[in-house]
Amino acid sequence: MSSQAEPSKGASNADPNEKVEKMHLPTDTAGGGVKVKVKEQEASPSDKNNLNPQSAGVSEVQVQDDTGARGSGARDLKVPKQMQAPKSSEEKSDVDGVPTRPVSERELRKRDAMQFIQRHQKVRNILAQYCPWLTDERLQLCIELKILFMQHFQDSRLVLYTAVMSFLFGYLRFGFLSLFIIMAVCIQYYRICDRRVKVNFKDDYTRYLSTRKLENDSETVTWLNTFLQQFWYIFEPSLSERITEITDQILSENVPSFIDSMALSEFTLGTKSPRMGFIRSYPKTEEDTVMMDLRLAFSPNDISDLTGREIAACIKPKIALDLKIGKSIASAKMPVLIEDLSFTGNLRVKVKLIDKYPYAKTVGLTFTEKPVFSYILKPLGGDKFGFDIGNIPGLTTFITEQIHNTLGPMMYSPNVYELDIESMMGAAGLNTALGAVEFKLRKGDGFKDGLGGAVDPYVVIKNSADRVIGKSKVAHNTGSPVFNETFYSVLNSFSENLNLEVYDFNDIRSDKLLGSAVLPLATLEAMPVTNDAFVELTLKGKTVGRLNYDMKFHAVVPDSGEEITKVDGPGVLQFTVHQCKELSNDPSKRPTAYAKLIINNKEVYTTRKIKKNNNPSWEESFGTLLPEGKNATLGVQIFTEESEHPFGTANVSLQDLFAATKTGLLWFPLQHAPSGRVRMSVMWKPAQLNNDSISSMALATPIGAIRIHLRSANNLHSKIPGKKCDSYARIMSHNTKQFRTVVIASNVNPFWDEYMYAPVITKHDIFFLQVMNYNSSGEDKLIGQTPINISNFINQGENGALMEYHDPRELTVPLSSTRGIKGNATITFKCDFFPSAVTTSLSPDVTPAPKASSTVATDKVNIEVLPESQKTPTAVDNTSTSRGSTSVKTSKPKKISELLMPSEAVNAALDFESGFMGFDIISYKIAKPAQELAIFLDDLPHHIFLSSALNVTGGATLHEYGNTFIRQLEYSQCTFKLLDGDKEVGSKTMLSRDLISKGATKPLEIAFPDGASILVAFRLTPVPVKLEEVEMYENMGEMTVDVIKATDLPAADSNGKSDPFVVFELQGEEVYRTKTHKRTLNPTFNESFEVELPCKQTCNFVANVFDWDFGNKDDHLGSCVIDCKLLQQQQQTNYEIPLDSKQGVLYLRITLSPKWVLRSKRAGNSSLVEGILGQTASIVGMPLKGISTVGNVAVDGVASVANLTNKMRKGISRGFKGIHHEKAK
């Protein structure tokens, strides 16, 4: 017996007189042994000076068994949370040394009461129906009394029965002997009950003890090792053959350039099977989870447990790898041998069970400690002259570390190696398919190379797994190619994307990437059809062109439980080529092969090349939609590098291959080939073809609205050296701009403090909050963005209804580029989610109600109906469908617009104060061509919709859709402007409530003064929203300020008087200046002016009193801040405000009149005027098409060029008045 002292982990806190040693015994289990704890007794003070004190010694010895089941000391690894074993009730009381929170008696009673009510839910439902007065507390009391009565009755019924029967027998005068009959019956009944109680208790207790034993102790599995040994003789040859095939294929694909070929010439694992030292189970896992620890050992050199006959027939493991170095004649083979393999390790296995084939969904594997490897490696000399490099000092350690470094990130704790058994067994794949996506690529435009020349573009379409599902034809020498090609892709989840990449074809050099785009497929769930849509292509953050496409979703037929026996009608197909065998009869010839999949005589997919392998294995599939599968034909063509012609082909009808897949007959001979066979299979699911043609984001009903309170951004950087950012923020979703803020000029830390609303179409939506750098003379640049996953804000109640979500925290997150690179810039915002209130009564005649995609904030570029969700959205134009789905024809010719609703639904929607207003510009009538229609809403300075050019005089059908969010329907106003270049031809303002009430049941005609008119249909999807006070209509308006007088002003002149005047500033900008009153300390002004108040909660309104001086700077007499929060709508508010100079009082009277005030005025002199035309003459929103802009003019949105001229006039006038005044003196 050998011993080795190991310090205890808790030695620092232990008794210094205690010593713990681990005694390693020659046990069967590696790492086993016993722990010996020795407690020594200190010597008495009188014996401390003696060399052998009598009082010192060992006072206590404890011996504890320590098996290897719990790890092996230094090699123990941290177990990840998902692989941790469940703790027993005793262990749960203290986790990692931290005691759990004590539970009060009140909490225990409340929890027990809830569990009690749940157990008696049926009784509760019945009593609630007939006894509504019976509360949960009373019900619990009644049931407890009933249980108590029944318990005591069961305990005492035998005594009661004995007494009653004895009384009856005596009363009937049966005599004394009758008591023996009663006693016999009672004794027999008692024995039966007693036996049943003992048996049940014994079974329960035995089960409890076995469960505890499974939890705490490991189990030897000699029976399993015996079975593995017998099974190993049969299984090992086929396993070694399969490993050889797979390894040869991997080696052939990864041959270094200086090696001609690599192949396994010999591979065997020997005749001795792997063994399990122990198994430890964890019975307290979830019902659908199995977890256990295994002690695995593979030591074929240990023959101590084999019989003489087994030793004589024993074959040891051996791996021989042949390397062929050099080329042709100058090549030479070099064998590499690996012998005497052994392995030992502790493996934790976690199996997730399911209730269908293959009944195990995933298997998680992780080593709880580093395994131990042993081997003999002979890279040179072979069997006879081979030298084991393990004898070289340090090399074995180096190789072992490399093995651990390779396997560690894969399956050493805390890493877990998960096997998807369901997918591996073929149960996933097409079984989980939701349907197929039909993608029709129409055309593209705007493509050019770096020098502006012509290109030869083609488009590659990939799925989310980056697998190519189609490649378009090459359009030569054109920047506006026309494709008109259709591609299909199997859709397994609505969270998938289509990736579009446009390349410039070149015969000599490699093809050049012109641009890429991502089409998220999330909105196919709500809007299965998208027609005539555009998507912007970007390259390094810049727009380089766009593609025009149609997209449809074809859903599979729901599974009825019946087995599909034949292929008929439309369906989703998954065609798989597995492998080929025996391509060459000569083993020395190893062809490099690849396969092409053929569907209906059309090549649809090409596999990867397998180098120098006689039995290549691809296991590659191609999924598509077949409009008719009954007469479809499938085929596989095998090609080799030696020839451009097919080496062999295999053709079969879809019906025959489907039947062969059912029976497992998957091997087919290669025709026109000297040898070889191919294994292929097919899966089929019937589908429903979608023949709808109408599609627009404005027709998709939002499930709710997301509100983003955007506070600020920090550390922004302009890409133009030496210039600060003119920044604004916007919300992107479904490749569409949903909302945007005002531009803050020349500020790297802009502060917006704006509320933005955007529609949520599906729970898979992803919004991108982007910060842009405004450029008046070119395209706006993206500074950075951050994604917002709407699924994080959606919660459902017990009945499945969506619930509101409010996060009181403000999030500050870094901004990243389109490539995901994060910088120093950050953005601060807060999100809320409000579900829509759409009911069945609000649904239209058509499919579930339509509702706007979004719409607000337009830009310089416009797009037609945008597709959908996002990954890295490109800056497609304005909101919801600016220049929207143009010229979309309705599928029902009798219906004027898809937005129209029944009058009952309209009245129900108008009961709500907020929601998304969708609109359909059905047709127009103009007298002059090349005009445009712009729509403005409430306090938004940017148009929410901009139509395409109206070129047809007289009248024409348009059908362009848009959508916007209405905050307060009672006060909301919508303005329609007809534009001719930079000139406003006509304008019409109406209440949004009137638009919906008159235009939701039938189209509403809106006429302009010059005889032009438009026909519009509306729809309201109500979304109840609790507005913040700063958003409300009552919080803004037009102030009428009466400057009455000032008293007791301080003297600034030598004569003891002052020449006072007052300057009023709103948000840091001068809005009014009173007249100057000479030589007085108590001036009476009696002046009045009007100014717009954007927000009485946040605006800073200041009055500054000055003393006028000729030729010198005016003296400041004092100032005061006017509290606008005191203002009430349509009421006069009197102010008597002392100046901050502690002398002087200013008297004002202010009246606030309700009015929508552009939110661009809230930023004061930090906002940037982006154009010269907007809702008012003094401020504009987004630059409209064809309208000139004033770039980088930092004004406040209140003062215009006329205001600047007025200041110059007043300054000159005051100068002349001063000169005249001095002369008068």
From Swiss-Prot:
One GO term under biological process is:
endoplasmic reticulum membrane organization
**Cellular compartment(s):** Endoplasmic reticulum membrane
Polar residues biased stretches = 1-15, 43-65, 869-890
Record-annotated residues binding Ca(2+) 1? 1053, 1059, 1107, 1109
C2 domain location is 413-534, 559-668, 685-803, 1019-1137
Any one GO cellular component localisation term in the record: plasma membrane
Basic and acidic residues bias (residue ranges): 16-25
Required co-factor(s) are: Ca(2+)
Q: Which GO terms describe its molecular function?
A: lipid binding; metal ion binding; phospholipid binding; protein-membrane adaptor activity
Keyword check for Transmembrane, yes or no.
Answer: yes
Q: Where is this region: Disordered?
A: 1-104, 867-890
Chain positions found as Phosphoserine = 843
Q: Does the keyword Repeat apply?
A: yes
Q: How does it sit in the membrane?
A: Single-pass membrane protein
Domain of life, per lineage: Eukaryota
Instruction: List all membrane-crossing ranges.
Output: 167-187
Q: What is its main location?
A: endoplasmic reticulum
SMP-LTD domain: which residues?
Answer: 217-422
Gene3D superfamilies noted in UniProt: C2 domain (2.60.40.150)
Q: Where is Ca(2+) 2 annotated to bind?
A: 1053, 1107, 1109, 1115
Enumerate the UniProt keywords alphabetically.
Calcium, Endoplasmic reticulum, Lipid transport, Lipid-binding, Membrane, Metal-binding, Phosphoprotein, Repeat, Transmembrane, Transmembrane helix, Transport
The protein depicted here goes by the name: Uncharacterized protein PYUK71.03c
Q: Which organism does this record belong to?
A: Schizosaccharomyces pombe (strain 972 / ATCC 24843)
